[in-house]
């Protein structure tokens, strides 16, 4: 009987002491919780086209962002995301960790990260889930979601597991920042790229930006990876498909005016077949009125293969972003799609889609 009594006593002691110790640790200044949500609507009035003819609502995402700061130099950041009304018992929606990393600051010019990290590619990839931070209805597909415009692959994946070095400082009297990220890269087989690579080659992403003036940003980003090629039985052939992409970025923000533009090119080359050269760009001009209304016009162009003719697609999108209250934003945008007959997705069928969103940051 002594052992059960001793066990009970130990459990009682633990139950008594653990809450006391927890009360002695004040984490109020160490943990910060933020988040955002996004609700969307899309409708294509015409009968022909690749838009949504059913006028659908989409509970697009709900995110919680944790910043844990154990010391002045150490930070842990994670974004937990639930998409499309996730319900696991019904196999609906998606739940994911958008990113989760530990960051150690050596100095302003050098911070080190390890974990699951969003690729520092262009203006929007690192913030693509944070819809309240994007005044457009969505990030431009011509650079960030090229598969939706007939591309064989995106210019870059969203994220990867690996190590990152980044920093900021002055360069000849001009503000500048850089980022270099090495991750497992994309896997083309069954392996989880956030757990295990399927070849020895690592993916490299790098970005460099300068600010010649407070209202001017010039940037360039580069991405490279080697993808494993498998045979019909799923065995690694030892051959690799090479992918390289780069994007040039420009942002001008004099006063209430905001102008953004990016131009990207990429190549996907299998070991024993001709490669595919993709090209995409967008430009958007907007103005802030009364610190609340931001009307804008966006133009996108994407060429899925520069070696093929008549496969381009162009999108013209007038819209407006309304800041209603604090972190509450309403977005209205009209997307006018025009494509040429050889485009594998749109096949030359033009159409217009009406879109709207309710984005909240908290």
Stretches found by the model and what they are:
Residues 16-22:
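Sec/Tat signal peptide C-region and signal peptidase I cleavage site
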Residues 24-44, 53-185, 200-202, 209-217, ...:
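Outer membrane beta-barrel
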Residues 40-49, 81-88, 121, 183-194, ...:
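Sequence/structural signature of outer-membrane beta-barrel proteins
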Residues 60, 82, 96-98, 184, ...:
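Transmembrane beta-barrel architecture of outer-membrane proteins
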Residues 209-305:
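Detector for outer-membrane/organellar transmembrane beta-barrel domains
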Residues 286-288, 292-327, 331, 335:
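Outer membrane beta-barrel transmembrane domains
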Residues 322, 327, 348-362:
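Outer-membrane beta-barrel "beta-signal"
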């Amino acid at each position: 009987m002594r052992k059960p009594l001793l066990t009970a006593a130990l459990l009682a002691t633990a139950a008594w002491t653990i809450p006391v110790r927890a009360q002695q640790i004040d984490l109020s200044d160490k943990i910060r919780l933020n988040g955002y949500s996004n609700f969307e609507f899309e409708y294509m009035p015409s009968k022909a086209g690749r838009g949504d003819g059913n006028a659908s609502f989409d509970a697009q995402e709900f995110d919680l962002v944790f910043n844990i700061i154990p010391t002045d130099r150490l930070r842990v950041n994670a974004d937990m995301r639930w998409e499309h009304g996730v319900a696991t018992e019904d196999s609906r929606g998606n739940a994911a960790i958008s990113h989760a990393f530990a960051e150690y600051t050596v100095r302003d010019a050098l911070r080190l990260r390890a974990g699951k990290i969003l690729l520092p590619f262009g203006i929007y990839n690192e913030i693509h889930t944070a819809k309240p931070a994007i005044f457009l209805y969505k990030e431009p597909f011509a650079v960030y979601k090229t598969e939706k415009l007939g591309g064989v692959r995106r210019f870059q994946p969203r994220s990867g597991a690996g190590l990152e070095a980044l920093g900021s400082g002055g360069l000849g009297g001009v503000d500048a920042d850089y980022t270099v990220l090495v991750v497992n890269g994309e896997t083309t087989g069954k392996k989880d790229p956030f757990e295990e690579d399927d070849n020895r080659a690592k993916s490299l992403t790098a970005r460099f930006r300068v600010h010649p003036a407070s209202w001017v940003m010039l940037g360039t980003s580069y991405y490279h990876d080697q993808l494993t090629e498998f045979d019909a039985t799923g065995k690694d052939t030892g051959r690799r498909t090479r992918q390289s992409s780069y994007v040039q970025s420009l942002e001008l923000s004099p006063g209430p005016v905001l102008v953004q533009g990016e131009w990207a090119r990429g190549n996907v080359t299998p070991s024993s077949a001709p490669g595919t050269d993709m090209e995409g760009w967008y430009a958007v001009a907007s103005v802030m009125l009364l610190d609340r209304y931001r009307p804008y016009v966006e133009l996108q162009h994407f060429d899925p293969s520069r070696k093929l003719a008549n496969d381009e697609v162009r999108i013209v999108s007038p819209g407006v972003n309304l800041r209603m209250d604090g972190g509450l934003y309403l977005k209205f945008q009209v997307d006018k799609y025009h494509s040429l007959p050889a485009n594998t997705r749109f096949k030359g069928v033009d159409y217009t889609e009406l879109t709207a969103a309710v984005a909240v940051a908290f």
